Amino acid sequence: MKNLKRILQFNKLWLLFGIFISIYVIFFTKIIRYSSKYDGDETQVRGKITSIKLDGNKLSFNLRAKENIIVNYYIQTEEEKNNILTLIHLGDMVYLRGSFSEPLDNTVPNTFSYKKYLYNKRIYYTFNASEYKIIGSNNLFYKIKDKLFKKIYNCENSDYYLAFILGDKSLLSSDIYDAYQKNGISHLLAISGMHINMLVLVISKVIKNEKKELFVTSLFLLLYLFLTGITASIVRAILFYILKKINKIMNLRYSNMHILILSAYFILLVNPFMLYDLGFIYSFVVCFGIVYYSDYIKGNYFMKLLKLSIITFLFSLPVTALVNYEINLLSILINIIFVPWISLLLYPFTLISFIIPFLSQILSFFIEITNNVNVFLENFSLLINIPKMPVVFVISFYLILLIKKKQNIIFLVLIIIVCELLPVLDFNYYVYYLDVGQGDCSILVSPQRKETIMIDTGGKVDYKTDDWKTKRKIYHLSDNTIKFLKSKGITSFMYMIITHGDADHAKESLNIMKNINVKNVVLNNGNVNCLEKEIVSSGINVTQKYNLKYFNIMNLNNDLYDNENDNSIINYVTFLRYKFLFMGDASTKVEEKLLNEYDLTNINFLKVGHHGSKYSTGKNFVNKLKPTYSIISVGRNNKYGHPNEEILNNLSDSKIYRTDQDGSIMFKIKKNKLRIKTYSP
């Protein structure tokens, strides 16, 4: 408790400055609302290129114009791709023709918001360029940065060179970076104080005068900051290093904690939006923990490493849980393996081999070992799901960490256990219609998560493309779905119902099965396609029978048609006093048959068939059902013209929700009381 008081009871100047910074950040980030200097309908723009990324056939760069803009340009030929980095340089002035696009917010709850991410960087638009023209060359600093970037990009081992030298992880393959993240060691790829100390080691050895050394290293580090693109973790590391040197030379006697907090104050004063930068949060939270517990990091090398890994793990846990909704309990041990390997061998050897290129073959060997061990250990990850932590839990977790008592670990574990139990203590029903673009994905959740059911998974057809167009990262449409599920504490499904085998309904099933425990899969009576064969061959139990307590589910369509859409499983779901009908992609022909065979009146929730196509949801069918709510799962600006205007007219007596306009839709039912929430883009 004394240590906690010591941290909280700064002198009045520090405390007042902290209060001022807090008010300052809130005022400039929450009260003032910023808007673009562009109208959004401009078709041309000019500015300076400040960063470049090339991935497959997509060239992206940051353009400094009236304001910062993200520019996307799609390369037309392989020859153009091979030459484009010799034509476009960092610092070039360019003239562009194309169109502005406003970034979309996250339409699936608890997932990454690209719109908020760009807003916090004061970027309000992306620009889709159709043509470009270089109208001015770059200056000296940008020439240095451009040459360094191009040299790294064309090197063998460019992925690690770019990560360790410029702090850019974009060239790392998705498999390798995912392994770093799952193993809890992705922080080793971020440039930190250790890297900064290593970079200036030579200068400190050559220049003995401390003031001259500070001057030279400060210039060098400021240049390095410019080269790396001024990211939060690098700014923190450099500022901390410089302030620590000043503190020593001027004999100011400030503690490392004072210097760290002063660094945070300074960064937030210059850019208050840094408070929402994930790199800033991770960097300061972990560094705070290390400085705060520095007295405990004692003993032999192994013990120091173990204690450091535990401190890093604990202080980063709430942030990691809020981002990924899971943590790897083995990351402490994995850090003990990788921290010395990367910090003492791989990182310094990467710098040396970049300067002495003939050593790159040895570096390749070290990288291969690193990647193989990393991927191998990923298979033994001990991942536990942590549903979205309430703010009060996060604050409590850190307050307990500030009280230096060994028995407090019990309270930290209790917080995690309670987080785990929160979904089990939820006695509501939920039905989610997730925004998966031009596809279908619905989720049923019973009280206490005792029964969870997924109806379709979403997806899209993978068209064969040339190798030069292929992106480095394998993107799955269901990655957002999986993150959402984990945020809600849903780690398994009793049933995954695939209404039919079309890609927009079933393509993401395998990726979901890889990440979420699916106990049973329900397939329709139609012919089994290649995707469905993969599902069956995975060894999962395939059934058409349900054993449920909270939901009553009937498949109303057991006939066999020539058209796969008409073979769709039509799910009639009832619970409490509510009736749900999920039509898959069934056409009006099947609808008429249903009306002849079943009493389908006063349906509360109609999942409209075939994304609102004109071949489904006939007037007669709607008049009979009299749906209260109609949900259309449809992609924004889709090429099919869905939903059809006639279908919207047919449904006009019901409340219509569309995923292209409303995003994901949640229906929460508690004691027959209905609450509706949408997540519009």
Which residues fall in each region the model found?
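Hydrophobic alpha-helical transmembrane segments in multi-pass membrane proteins
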Residues: 2-8, 13-23, 127, 176-332, ...
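Membrane-interface helix/helix-cap signal primarily in integral membrane proteins
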Residues: 3-7, 18-187, 465-467, 476-483, ...
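Aromatic-rich juxtamembrane segments at the membrane interface
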Residues: 120-240, 245-246, 314, 494-495, ...
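Core dinuclear metal-dependent hydrolase active-site scaffold
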Residues: 272-275, 378-381, 385, 389-392, ...
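Active-site HxH/HxHxD metal-binding segment of metal-dependent hydrolases
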Residues: 497, 503-537, 627
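Cap/insert and terminal regions of metallo-dependent hydrolase folds
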Residues: 593-664
